Amino acid sequence: MDADFRFDPDGSDDDGAAASAAAGRRKPAQSPWEFSSYAESVAAEHARRRTTSIDEKISQALSGSRRGGKPSIPDGDSEGDEDDSEVEDDSEEDDKEVVEGEIDDEEDEVEESEDDDEGVEVSDEEVEELEEGKGEEKSDEVEEGEEGQDGEEEEKEEGDEEAAEEEEETDKKSGVVDPSKFFASSEGASFHANSFLELNLSRPLLRACEALGYQKPTPIQAACIPLALTGRDICGSAITGSGKTAAFSLPVLERLLFRPKRVPAIRVLILTPTRELAAQVHSMIEKLAQFTDIRCCLIVGGLSTKVQEVALRSMPDIVVATPGRIIDHLRNSLSVGLEDLAILILDEADRLLELGFSAEIQELIRMCPRRRQTMLFSATMTEEINELVTLSLNKPVRLEADPSLKRPATLTEEVVRIRRAREANQEAVLLALCLKTFKDKVIIFSGTKHSAHRLKIIFGLSGMKAAELHGNLTQAQRLEALELFKKQEVDFLIATDVAARGIDIVGVRTVINFSCPRDARTYLHRVGRTARAGREGYAVTFVTDDDRSLLKAIAKKAGSQLKSRIVAEKPVAECAKLIEELEDQISTIIQEEREERILRKAEMEATKAENMIAHKDEIYSRPKRTWFATEKEKKLLAKAAKESTSQGKSNSGVISAQQAEDLRLKEKKRREREKNLPRKKRRRLEAEREMLEDESEDEEEAKESKGGKKEKKGQSLVDVAYRRAKSMKASGKRGAGTGKGKNDKKAKQHSGKGPTRQEEMQELFQNDMSEWKQGRSLKKNNVMRKKSKNSFKSKSRYNRRK
């Protein structure tokens, strides 16, 4: 035990703060994230696959370019480019124009420039037009954030317990939840604490907080830790970077210190949406539990299943997992279960539902004991989150430390306007910005995996140290990229939205949105990677002309914080020329990777065939791996999600797989019922259905003609059959001499509107039927068809009809 550590609960807050500051000066704080163990496995992975890393390919290309003459890279510290960047606040001036400026290479901070020697003006007119323009649209994210705060501090009415339970059950069935009835009162929860000593934590955890450099709890930690220690269910929401991981980790570790140690069991399950976030939470818990005997294991996809199975059989106290892999182990691994689970934690719950894990979450909740503590944490609260809360939590306490869409005050947000003429040079704009202004500790968010990989190659060939993080990499490569960026061995981390949630890397100065995020919520989580825990940070977003609506929504929420950054033409032109010269090397590297991928796939197939021959009996003797949903159910769920997305439904309109199955069975029963009808009724129903479809088509065509929109559409089989029958009827009339001549046809066209399509369909339908089926009211040669005398029941009826 550290002799310098002092436990002095009776001392003043100032003395404790001074002591902790002195301890911090004596010993550097540890980093909570450790991914170094995966770096060695990446080298072994490449050796096993007989492939080379992208960095080796880039170094080979650079060595070849040196022999053949290397393209000139723009210097970021040239004297002629001083004072090239100009930035102004949106609230400074009105009625200006955004004009391309130049980049400031002397300071990383954005300042206002008063030098107008080159005739460059800085303007935010587009931002103001979007704020005050016609037809403004309110952002859904703001409305959701405001709705999520309603009923936050209402107290639950006391009454008969049985009646309350019945009301809750009916609410759950109907999907309507009254916050005042469902959530417990948050009275007594305090969002302020001077030190961790006030939170009733044990000495080992206080030592761990001291080693990590934690001196004062954040608001969500101060409110969550005391309530979690009492075993209450919690629904927590706070801004990104507010310390949610430590908010649920510390009370969990405190409770596990007093567990029955004679019986090992899995007592805590933590679910995260991504593998990187799971690895980060696992590393954080190991750092906080370094002075205890609590064991924790990581269960995510992309890593060895056998190693994870052995770890689960050893019954660790805490399991940090992604939903799919933990369900796989619970169903297919022996001696692995959640019978003794005491705490279930859902981290980044909104992201879990966005990625389609709702069915997996419900299955895990079903497998967990009912008498458990459940904690749910999310940066934003949506309707789907509220539905999940009603299913998994029991009288939870809702804690909202900050507004869900509030960004840190230390964050400086900027916009780089990409004109339509410069969209082809967007990579050059990014390269110029990174060469001159933002040179280290930068996360660049790309929209696609292909774009992120291409940017990695461009940065490498330009002599800039960068790492990539996206779904095309193996899990070891993804974690190695995080470790390299954390150790500052690379200056840039080029990632997709995989890194947009929960990833907390100390010291990130800048976030660049190379591709504009899909909505304001995604923007919030991206820029939340910087300016964390009170530090300063910059967020730069590239906005094209097609992203004006999103820029308007961001500007409305950001207010005067949003600034306009101007990038000069000269450095962009130099970088565009450089990228053009590097295109041959980029295509060569991509071709090498493609060939390696094809070769590796062929080797895998050959190895698989050899193993099937050599170990045939062992392979076929293994039990088949099962899943909680069948292939049919998974297809139905995917189809329902696709239909709801294509129809543009809201979150409340998304149907489940069971509902989709019910609709399919209902349609099947209707078809069977129609099949058993008499032929006459069945044909009548079919004719009515065709008429309704024709009427709807006519209405759509009329609307399109009114709106002036004409689209070329192919003809369906029904239309072809209809036109064919119509032409055959017309030719038959002409053959019989009853058809109209050409002059009559032209006269009819000029005289007025002809019969509608519905009338023509009725006429065709009646002509196909016999006279008997057309009904008694049909006339032939203006004479009613007479019935025979034998068809009447009595002579009096025959006389009356006579």
UniProtKB/Swiss-Prot annotation:
Binding residues annotated for ATP, in chain numbering: 238-245
Motif (DEAD box): 347-350
Residue interval(s) of motif Q motif: 194-222
Keyword Kinase: no
Domain Helicase C-terminal: 429-573
Gene Ontology cellular-component annotations: nucleolus
Keywords linked to the UniProt accession: ATP-binding, Coiled coil, Helicase, Hydrolase, Nucleotide-binding, RNA-binding
Ranges annotated as biased composition (Polar residues): 644-659
GO MF annotations, alphabetized: ATP binding; ATP hydrolysis activity; RNA binding; RNA helicase activity
Free-text domain note: The Q motif is unique to and characteristic of the DEAD box family of RNA helicases and controls ATP binding and hydrolysis.
Name assigned to this protein: DEAD-box ATP-dependent RNA helicase 28
Source organism: Oryza sativa subsp. japonica (Rice)
Organism lineage: Eukaryota, Viridiplantae, Streptophyta, Embryophyta, Tracheophyta
